[in-house]
Amino acid sequence: MWNKVQETVNYLKERTNYSPVYGVILGSGLGSFTQDIAIDFTIPYSEIPNFPISTVQGHSGALVFGKINGISVVAMQGRFHYYEGYDMQTVTFPVRVMRYMGIQTLIVSNASGGVNPNYKVGDIVLIKDHINLFPDHPLRGKNEERFGPRFVNMSEPYSKELILKAKAIALQNQIEVKDGIYLGLQGPTFETLAEYKMVKILGADCVGMSTVPEVIVARHMDLACLGVSVITDMGDEENIEEVNHDEVLLAAQKAEPHVRQLIREFISAQS
């Protein structure tokens, strides 16, 4: 894994000469955030050594290098999911590459189902913690000490400092945000009524099929993380809504202008 990461980093450095400060992972229906970037390079995943290929609708499949208010960023237009058949090391490989490209902070976005009755479709939720119910773990196996320690402290997976900054940015820009706990399941099926009830009983506010593995690997390498969920459907155990992927994409796209603004202004404020 170490050699593959270094090979990929060297390729991207030679091609872009970039040392980004922020890495951004764009979830389902949120890919147009790249319109807010002064783009210098767009590299399809298919051209990048050792990179997997995104197979899910709503995930374009390219690394975008550019600047926001003069700050260097790299954005993933499309992520990789465990349910696509990739192992966890492959799902999280881009996070390791971005870390060794130079990023200091990882911003992760996703579309998720809400179980908190105070949520509604279209809400933006800042993730304050997560529950990991994936059947595999990205750090399972022999530890590579050059990446990070064998046992990772996960008491603060999402930086409290970054959450406070994001809330302040949201307030300044009149963007309504909530916070909550995200629960990660493998997918690709949407949750049953009983599973939504389980999510709620376990103490989560929303549920999705990504983010958790990426944040675990980011914390393994001591990266600060900010997580942003868009609520695209509601899982009320008394009145479950029928949902499909097209509806999820549509709901995410409707909320996207505010998500874009929040992330753009958050990064700009750090200059």
Residue positions per predicted region:
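Zn-dependent metallopeptidase/amidohydrolase metal-coordination segment
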Residues: M209-E247
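Active-site rim beta-loop-alpha module in soluble metabolic enzymes
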Residues: N153-K200
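Generic non-transmembrane alpha-helical segments
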Residues: Y11, R15, E161, K165-E176, ...
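Short acidic/polar active-site loop segments enriched in Thr and Asp
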Residues: Q104-T105, D205, A224
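Metabolite-binding pocket within alpha/beta catalytic cores that recognizes anionic/polar moieties
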Residues: M1-M154
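His/Asp/Glu-rich mid-to-C-terminal helical/loop segments that flank catalytic regions of hydrolases
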Residues: G235-S271
